Amino acid sequence: MATTTGLTEVVLYDTLVNYLISMARLVEGAMNRALDAIVSFESERTASLPGEVFLLEPRINEMEIVIDEHAVRLLRRGSFTEDETRLIVAALKITNDLERIGDIAVNIAERVVSLRDMTQAQTPEELAPMAEAVRSMVSRSLGALIFRNAELAAQVLECDDIVDQYGDRIFEHLLQRMTKDVSRVTPDLQFVLATRHLERIADHATNIAEDIIFWVRGLDVRHGRGLALLPEQQQEDVVVRRTADVTDNSSALYSGVTPSCETQRV
């Protein structure tokens, strides 16, 4: 009987992790479509992507509810090991950040719909590499979740400042452009909002990475605490491939872009 009970508990906790991974894949799929759409909003190849993002939102919201209910079911079981407690706490927080990334993907898709009707709209030069840096952060967070890899999660924390720097430079460029040509104010404000959306996705990816480190290592690295306690990166790195639902045109659209925070080896 004890063995059966133990096996049941293992299955329940593995199910929670699998639910998280499933939700993360949906969210990354929505985000990738939104990023492809905003960077190449004029292309006919990306015209259908905003609609696909809108269709994914209810599925993401449903997964949030499923995970919350499953976590509550685990909490009702009573006693937990330290690892199990950290997993439940991290899962509830990660789910919230994933749901917010899904919402932001919808916000970006809405910007794209508006921009496609604006003749003066012109994509800022650094928006593509900024989007790639954000894409990489979310991809690494998903990889860290799948492989329970604290070192990969720590790499995400290092990228947040780079995304903020892109956002600051794009804002300055757009401000100068709007000052010189008032006809660009309406479309450029859409891009200002889009860069803010990207920064928020990066913030949520950072939160997820911090929660994964807490779950795997028991370290609270929020606000820079305890990060020095993480071990150095292993000598021989292994490429982490993105297994998420990436849009087909992503590689073609960005084949010439070298992001500052690209997917690395762990």
Where are these regions (language model features)?
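Cytosolic, long alpha-helical scaffolding segments
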Residues: 1-266
